[in-house]
From Swiss-Prot:
Protein's membrane topology: Multi-pass membrane protein
Sequence positions that bind Mg(2+): 642, 644, 983
Record's compositionally biased regions (Basic residues): 190-201
Function: This magnesium-dependent enzyme catalyzes the hydrolysis of ATP coupled with the transport of calcium. Transports calcium to the vacuole and participates in the control of cytosolic free calcium.
Group of enzyme by EC: translocase
Compartment(s): Vacuole membrane
Protein name: Calcium-transporting ATPase 2
Main location: membrane
Transmembrane segments: 328-348, 371-391, 542-562, 586-606, 1041-1061, 1069-1089, 1119-1139, 1154-1171, 1192-1212, 1224-1244
Domain of life: Eukaryota
Bias-annotated ranges (Basic and acidic residues): 179-189, 202-229
Length: 1414
């Protein structure tokens, strides 16, 4: 075998395996050629299909790279079709992903599955949209979650900087288009025109091409063999022929300069190697060609980086231009320019006026300052636009950083012969990457080897099947052996964006970044983020306020114009310039009123609040993926949390165990004697048990037993050792597996790497939640051995023997085993219970030997593997290990805070009841009235029982992801706002279904993260409390700003309107420039100040708001109205009676001073009211947390300083004059009075205001009872078929009895048996008798549990104190402190605590006998 062309390594024991036979390069003459997808523009597209001489092959693609739908006229051959099924990432009973290879036949044209992409016949299997590119106008492409199928999903609120008319290929000189046109990106050019001089909008709207054309790719691949586009086209469409043309996998590896087993040759600086010392290129096997010596940078230059090009950010100038394009501002700008022109003409084109006063008794010229107002308005507009644009620019930068953080993740690769963890962006073409369950494949690749790898490609291609991956050689063999009419099934292609459902394997990367399948789709889907629910609410409110403000402005303009026309008659002496100036003043004041009334700061406030919140949340290990989730968490009522890693530290360590059955080992036995259940005294001791320290385990186990124990741990594991960021070696993988590997390392047994490399693996059984176990079959000389590890109570049932150790330490070299007996089974059960009650996770390790493979009497399934059920029996138990996962610090306090905030916490865990209840009791989750139940039982409940149990269910043990999803669905149907944590691939549906999904940042799979809204980067439950706090902080910030702005709006509109209409000169007491300054204060400055308050724990002191709660609460409404009325009264009194109150004469100087005083009082009322609006509750301390918010302090000082400068030096620009000490004193007193008035409002009872608002129909009646949705009401009575029939009969009975009975909801007509409206005959009523009896019996028997005999599942008979988790199947537990009169006791036939005559212990330190069981 040539050294330059190493063969792929295929692990198989089947002599007929396709891997052991070479495939001919051409198919047999009698074989039907494999149908191929015709690429638009390629030579093949001009010719006919091999089997379609007329050129009407139904499998051809249309010229625009889209599939012809059946019956479209392009496809004369009938096409098979089936209902399209929405993609599902899970394999539950309700999943759309199934393992089936059923083919369509004329007799069965609708198969259960669609194998479109796999056999290259998309429309023959209803895969019409498999390769259809997403249209950029499709609303779904803008969805923040629904289309998030890959690594680069983005919710940044920026416009699309890419049009992707042609896919980009990274070359040595930069990004270029694949057709070899100019190297610049035409999509970024604005205003480009076609030959007719029109902008090419049509081209911009077309979706990007779904295919690449290698013939137009001018990229020079030297030193590699293949161009980037040619490699990318291997998977789009999947083409085994194209792969064969480049030499198959061996030719591909040779062309890329990579070893199929040891990966790329790199130096030690390319990542964290498994052993810290990857081999150099000189040590690597392979060729000596230039491609073998190419650097990583060279690979990136040719094939690109695994990172999508950054979207073009809007510059500050562009944001300013977009802000200035507001129609109202444009109108105001036009008016300001006209005013400036008239002012300049007045000042420069006309002689100055001569005025006489005390200072100028002989007369002097009036100052030429008419131009100042126009300039001031222009400057004010510029400031408003500039400040708003800077805010948007800063917000965009924050979201950009957030997206960069969110897109960051690690992947496992093989480089230099060692496994290492690198950043996903560092993956290059040629890398050998590892596949693991739950991973979202980040790049395109070709499968090399693996065990039972199945992928869900529905999210990437619409393919609804779970597709198993095979090696290239197996695919070639299948193709060459196809009979006429058969289609290719086996697939070796891996598509980016697909999800690994199960299995482990390796693949070589062939396309990354924008050239990958998913990369091109993600580039096409780029767009602005959707608005959050709160933004939508505020936009509606802002639109309403703007309409009212616009109506006020229009009404003011009409009123002033009427006065203007009247004065044309009554005062004809005015010059034309005066008339024009007066008209412009009317227009300016009306437009300015509209500017002030339009609350453009409302959307800004929520955006700023979200931007600041998400930035600070990221620093606190909360990565927000969907902005709306922040708002939703504010009103969360239930949190369904995992146990492992969320409530506990997820740093598992083996602290106790049982070697065989009798040898109980404990870590640090002298300090932890209570962790051994051996010789615990009379009534608890088990004959033959003995304890020893874990460090002495090698003294009690023979060398053969040590080897067996070590192999059971090391071979049956996917974890490995790696260097962390600090350069220290640690284990990477499942926490349970890493704990066992660390245990083996502490025992100083042979290194796991050596053990794995020496093992010849025949079959692997990956872990699944259904099996609750994982295993591996290895060949040992002429025999085969199965190693299994998993849940102890599950695997113990499958064992019939156990290893034997002796207390005296005498041992030989052989492994001694013995049969199970009744005492042994009881011992194992009590050991499991003992460990579980100490919150230890129990893992059993066992093995079984076979003489041949497959074993006699068994057959391999369709996947060429022996079924698990056929071999997982009659095993020998090696050991049961107790793994400790201590509680995270502060978890109990966090649970208490949730409960204080009105958020119920429910634990959903896969652990047994005893462990789950112990942890829940320590955390404070299991409280009086709480219910404990197992997942299988909860799943079997009727809808009505589930609705009754769900609110009180606190622990759902042994639950599957489907159970968690069902619980979430039930809670949501009851109107709860549900948050859910998840870390596994199968948690995806529950995370999607929940109102807010939390994924684990450390232990979570990529599928879980992709389905989530928020990622807990440190997997801690405490961060869920932080999310609630920040969510309420965002909502509170927006409400604070809303309370402030509406009061300013009302005051400004009333004062301006009344003073302008009452003025003889059509002038408002607040000029246009002054109103623009007020607008700047109430929109931008207030949004920055009030939307940046940090989250505080005081927000947890209240219950969550209802879903239909109004945006403006009664307290807010009360404060808004009182403050607005106070400010209107003060300002209007000063305006109309100020001269008399202050004892001033009526002249121009005093009027100007009075106008400045009114303006100053108005502004300082807003400044002090801004302080007042920092609180929404009835507490009086408005300065709480004031000194912690630097934004508020700085903006408060800017507003005060700016107002002082305006009054003191603003002069003619703001039409004010300097104020004396008395006036400043009046200003500060009037402004500061807002604070005591606010305190008085808070002390005023809310009841009268609430009743008034209800009578005015502004608010809904809070005393009105909530109603169930029609769906929930129907489900309420569908739990028992007998009672459904009773309901039908009661409906009939109500026709005769009527009245009171008819008022009951029980008499609603059943959807199961609708009755006619005709009269019912009396004999029909007799049907009530049997159905009522049946209903009573059915309801009573619904919870009856059959008697369990003594055995492993129930070793103590009916005594629950000594029961394993198996005992609780079909049972319900209540907390011992539950009220004895609780109706659940009677409903489920439970025995209240005191009736048993036993004392009731507290929730803490609960023993297995403290709970009530059925």
């Amino acid at each position: 075998m040539s050294r330059n062309n190493p063969p792929p390594v295929i692990i198989t024991t089947d002599p007929d395996s396709p891997a052991l036979h070479s495939a001919p390069s051409t198919p047999p003459p009698n074989q039907r050629p494999t149908p191929t997808l015709v690429i638009p523009g390629s030579p093949a597209s001009e010719s006919s299909h091999p089997e379609s001489p007329q050129g009407n092959d139904p499998f051809r693609l249309s010229p625009n790279a889209r599939l012809y739908p059946p019956g479209s006229g392009h496809s004369p051959t009938p096409s098979y079709s089936s209902a399209l099924t929405p993609p599902s990432p899970t394999l539950t009973s309700s999943s759309s992903v199934h393992f089936s290879d059923e083919l369509p036949t004329p007799s069965s044209p609708n198969p259960k599955t669609s194998l479109a992409l796999r056999d290259n016949h998309p429309d023959a299997r209803s895969g019409m949209e498999t390769l259809q590119t997403v249209d950029e106008n499709d609303p779904q492409r803008r969805h923040a979650r629904g289309w998030s199928i890959g690594t680069w999903s983005s919710a940044a609120p920026t416009a699309d900087g890419y049009s992707m008319k042609k896919p980009l290929i990274r070359t040595a000189t930069g990004a270029s288009e694949v057709d070899g046109d100019r190297g610049e990106d035409d999509a970024n050019k604005k205003g480009k025109k076609d030959k007719k001089g029109k902008k090419g909008k049509k081209d911009k709207e077309e979706p990007p091409s779904a295919h690449l054309d290698p013939d137009k790719d001018k990229t020079d691949p030297t030193p590699f063999r293949e161009k980037p586009s040619r490699l990318a086209m291997l998977v789009d469409p999947k083409s085994l022929e194209d792969l064969e043309k480049i030499g198959g996998v061996s030719g591909l590896l040779e062309g890329l300069g990579v070893d199929g087993e040891k990966g790329l040759a790199v130096g030690t600086d390319e990542g964290n190697a498994e052993n810290g010392a990857p081999r150099s290129s000189a040590d690597m096997p392979g060729g000596n060609g230039p491609q073998w010596r190419a650097s990583m940078d060279r690979r990136r230059d040719i094939y690109g980086r695994n990172d999508l090009p950054r979207r073009k950010s809007k510059s500050l100038l562009l944001l300013m231009w977009l802000a200035f394009k507001d129609k109202v501002l444009i109108l105001l700008s036009v008016a300001a320019v006209v005013s400036l022109a008239l002012g300049l003409y007045q000042d420069l084109g006309t002689p100055p006026k001569i005025i006489y006063n005390d200072e100028c008794p002989d007369g002097c010229e009036e100052a030429q300052v008419d131009w100042v107002e126009g300039v001031a308005i222009v400057v004010a507009i510029i400031i408003v636009v500039l400040v708003g644009s800077i805010n948007d620019w800063q917000k965009e930068r924050q979201f950009k950083k957030l997206n960069e953080k969110r897109e960051d993740r690690n992947v496992k690769v093989i480089r230099g012969g060692s496994e290492m963890v690198i950043n996903v962006k560092d993956v290059v073409v040629g890398d050998v990457c590892l596949l693991e369950p739950g991973e979202i494949i980040p790049v395109d690749g070709i499968f090399l080897r693996g065990h039972n790898v199945r992928c869900d490609e529905s999210g990437a291609t619409g393919e609804s099947d779970a597709i198993k991956k095979f090696s290239y050689d197996e695919c070639i063999k299948e193709r060459d052996n196809l009979q006429p009419g058969q289609r290719q099934k086996k697939d070796c292609f891996l598509i980016s964006g697909a999800k690994v459902l199960e299995g482990v394997g390796e693949y070589v990367v062939i396309a990354v970044g924008p050239t990958s399948f998913n990369g091109r789709i993600m580039m096409a889907m780029r767009g602005d983020a959707d608005e959050t629910p709160l933004q939508i609410k505020l936009n509606h409110l802002a639109e309403l306020i703007a309409k009212l403000g616009g109506a006020s402005g229009l009404l003011l303009f009409i009123a002033l114009m009427i006065r203007f026309f009247v004065q044309l008659k009554t005062n004809p002496d005015r010059s034309a310039n005066d008339k024009a100036q007066s008209f412009i003043q009317i227009l300016i004041i009306a437009v300015t009123l509209v500017v002030v009334a339009v609350p453009e700061g409302l959307p800004l406030a929520v955006t700023l609040a979200l931007a600041f919140a998400t930035k600070r949340m990221t620093k606190q290990n909360l990565l927000v993926r969907v902005l709306g989730s922040c708002e939703t968490m504010a009103n969360a009522t239930v949190v369904c949390t995992d146990k492992t890693g969320t409530l506990t530290q997820n740093e598992m360590t083996v602290v106790a165990g049982s070697l065989g059955v009798h040898g109980k080992f404990v870590k640090d036995l002298s300090d932890n004697a209570s962790r051994s259940n051996a010789n615990e005294g009379e009534g608890h001791s088990v004959h033959g048990d003995f304890s020893f320290d874990m460090s002495q385990l090698n003294d009690y186990a023979s060398s053969s037993l040590q080897t067996l124990f070590n192999e059971a741990i090391c071979i049956n594991s996917t974890a490995f050792e790696d260097k962390n960021e600090e350069g220290k070696l640690n284990f990477v993988g499942s926490k349970t597996e890493t704990a066992l590997l660390r245990f083996a390392k502490d025992m100083e047994w042979p290194n796991y790497r050596q053990v794995r490399e020496s093992a010849e693996i025949v079959q692997m059984i990956p872990f699944s939640s259904e099996l609750k176990a994982m295993g591996v079959v290895v060949r040992k000389d002429d025999t085969y051995r199965l190693y299994l590890k998993g849940a102890s109570e599950v695997l113990s049932n499958n064992c019939t023997r156990h290893v034997v150790v002796h207390q005296d330490g005498n041992k030989g070299d052989d492994i001694e085993t013995t049969e199970f007996d009744d005492d042994t089974m009881s011992n194992i059960s009590k050991t499991i219970i003992f460990y579980a009650n100490q919150s230890l996770r129990t893992i059993a390790l066992c093995y079984r030997d076979f003489e041949s493979w497959p074993p006699a009497g068994t057959e391999k399934d369709g996947a060429d593997e022996v079924p698990y059920e056929a071999i997982a029996k009659d095993m020998t138990l090696i050991a049961i290990t107790g793994i400790e996962d201590p509680l995270r610090p502060g978890v109990r306090e966090a649970v208490e805070k949730c409960q204080l905030a009105g958020v119920a916490v429910k634990m959903c865990t896969g652990d047994n009841v005893l462990t789950a209840r112990s942890i829940a009791s320590q955390c404070g989750i299991f409280t009086a009235g709480g219910v404990v139940m197992e997942g299988p039982l909860f799943r079997k409940l009727s809808d009505s029982d589930r609705l009754e149990i769900a609110p009180r269910l606190q622990i759902l043990a042994r639950s599957s992801p489907e159970d968690k999803r069902l619980l979430v669905k039930t809670l949501k149907s009851m109107g709860e706002v549900v948050g859910v944590t998840g870390d596994g691939t199968n948690d995806g549906p529950a995370l999607k279904l929940a109102n807010v999904g939390f994924a684990m940042g450390i232990a979570g799979t990529e599928v879980a993260k992709e389905a989530s809204d928020i990622i807990l980067m440190d997997d801690s439950f405490k961060n869920i409390v932080l999310a609630i706090m920040w969510g309420r902080c965002v909502n509170d910030s927006v409400k604070k700003f809303l309370q402030f702005q509406i009061s300013v709006n009302i005051t400004a509109v009333f004062i301006t309107f009344i003073s302008a209409v009452a003025s003889s000169s059509e002038e408002s007491v607040l000029t246009a420039v002054q109103l623009l300054w007020v607008n700047l204060i109430m929109d931008t400055f207030a949004a920055l100040a009030l939307a940046t308050d940090p989250a505080t724990e005081s927000s947890l002191d209240r219950k969550p708001d209802r879903k239909n709660a109004p945006l403006i609460t009664v307290e807010m409404f009360k404060m808004i109205m009182v403050q607005a009325i106070y400010q209107i009264i003060v300002c209007l009194v000063l305006h109309f009676a100020g001269l008399k109150i202050l004892g001033l004469e009526d002249n121009d100087q005093n009027n100007t001073e009075l106008g400045a005083l009114v303006f100053n009082c108005f502004v300082f009322c807003q400044i002090f009211n801004q302080l007042n609006c920092r609180r929404l509750d009835r507490k009086l301390n408005v300065l709480e947390g004031f000194w912690r918010n630097w934004y508020f302090i700085i903006i408060f000082l800017i507003m005060v300083g700016g107002q002082i400068l305006i009054v003191e030096v603003g002069g003619a620009a703001f039409q004010v004059t300097r104020l004396g000490g008395r006036d400043w004193g009046i200003t500060l007193v009037i402004g500061a009075l807002s604070l005591p008035i606010g305190a008085l409002v808070r002390l005023t009872p809310t009841g009268p205001f609430a009743r008034l608002l209800v009578k005015l129909h502004i608010y809904a009646d809070p005393n009105k009872l909530p109603e169930l949705s029609p769906e929930a009401e129907e489900e309420q009575y569908s739990y028992n078929p007998a009672l459904s029939r009773v309901k039908d009969n009661l409906s009939t009975y109500a026709r005769i009895r009527g009245g009171r009975l008819r008022a009951s909801s029980m008499v609603a007509k059943s959807r199961n048996a609708q009755l006619r409206d005709a009269d019912i005959q009396f004999p029909s009523l007799l049907t009530m008798v049997p159905t009522v009896i049946a209903g009573t019996v059915g309801a009573g028997a619904h919870w009856v549990t059959p008697h369990n005999s003594i055995g492993l599942s129930n070793p103590a008979g009916q005594d629950p104190s000594y029961s394993t988790a198996e005992l609780f199947k079909g049972k319900v537990q209540l907390h011992p402190r539950t009220n004895p009169d609780d109706p659940l006791y009677a409903k489920f036939g439970l025995q209240p605590p005191e009736s048993r005559g036993s004392s009731v212990s507290g929730a803490e330190g609960l023993s297995s006998g403290d709970a009530n069981n059925v």
